[in-house]
């Protein structure tokens, strides 16, 4: 109620304690009474816990501390906010009136974040140096949330009642977290033209001939994909099972 957990008034109920009721009725008969009040004889089963129970009040207070948490996940030009509406649905109270966070629900929330924001190895639109829009598929570039560690991170922040902006824990990262995760600094390679274009902050600053893999020898360079640059070397010898090739610069 009013955005907080509150303890409801206990209900005395109408479930009889059979043994107490039997004794009360038996006593009334023996005493020649025409009526007996089972309520006055305390024959109804009492609530297990009352509103003023100190342990229950403490659990409710602790649960409300979590509702003040507000965690903003930063995805560059997009944000996802976890607030009291979401958190209230994650808090589960047990039969002993203690509470915990429902890890299955948190896991599902993080899973949905991954479906929405993970880009690792996915297809994406790309505008080439000459203005063509093509679709690049696969590769080893992109962002991928570490689901298990992000669940643990989110649970810890909620339990602490934190208000903060964070990034998920990532398994793979790119250079830009915006919707266009390639950013404005990248290298475009045309295998057909044997040419490379280096873009920095959206401007082409280098255009140079390159030599890609030898197709006839079975060492072709993968095409139509987005790849992270794992290394760059000068005056290097490329060594394979059946070849050695001297290069002045290699990516």
What are these regions (language model features)?
Residues 1-245, 249:
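Surface-exposed, secretory/extracytoplasmic low-complexity segments enriched in Ser/Thr/Asn/Gly/Pro
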């Amino acid at each position: 109620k009013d955005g907080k957990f509150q303890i409801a008034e206990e209900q005395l109920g109408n479930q009889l304690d059979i043994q107490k009721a039997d004794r009360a009725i038996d006593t009334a008969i023996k005493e020649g009474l025409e009526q007996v009040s089972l309520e006055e004889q305390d024959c109804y089963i009492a609530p297990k816990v009352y509103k003023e129970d100190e342990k229950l009040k403490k659990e409710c207070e602790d649960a409300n501390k979590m509702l003040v948490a507000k965690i903003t996940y930063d995805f560059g030009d997009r944000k996802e906010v976890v607030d009291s509406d979401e958190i209230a649905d994650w808090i589960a109270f047990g039969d002993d009136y203690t509470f915990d966070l429902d890890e299955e629900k948190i896991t599902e929330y993080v899973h949905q974040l991954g479906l929405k924001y993970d880009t690792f190895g996915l297809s994406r639109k790309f505008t080439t140096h000459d203005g063509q829009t093509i679709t690049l598929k696969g590769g080893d570039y992109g962002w991928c949330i570490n689901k298990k560690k992000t669940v643990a991170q989110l649970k810890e922040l909620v339990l602490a009642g934190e208000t903060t902006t964070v990034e998920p824990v990532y398994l793979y990262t790119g250079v830009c977290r915006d919707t266009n995760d390639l950013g404005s600094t990248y290298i475009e390679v045309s295998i057909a033209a044997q040419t490379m274009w280096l873009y920095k902050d959206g401007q082409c600053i280098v255009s140079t001939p390159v030599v890609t893999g030898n197709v006839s020898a079975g060492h072709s360079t993968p095409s139509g994909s987005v790849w992270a640059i794992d290394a760059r070397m000068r005056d290097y010898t490329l060594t394979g099972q059946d070849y050695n090739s001297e290069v002045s610069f290699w990516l």
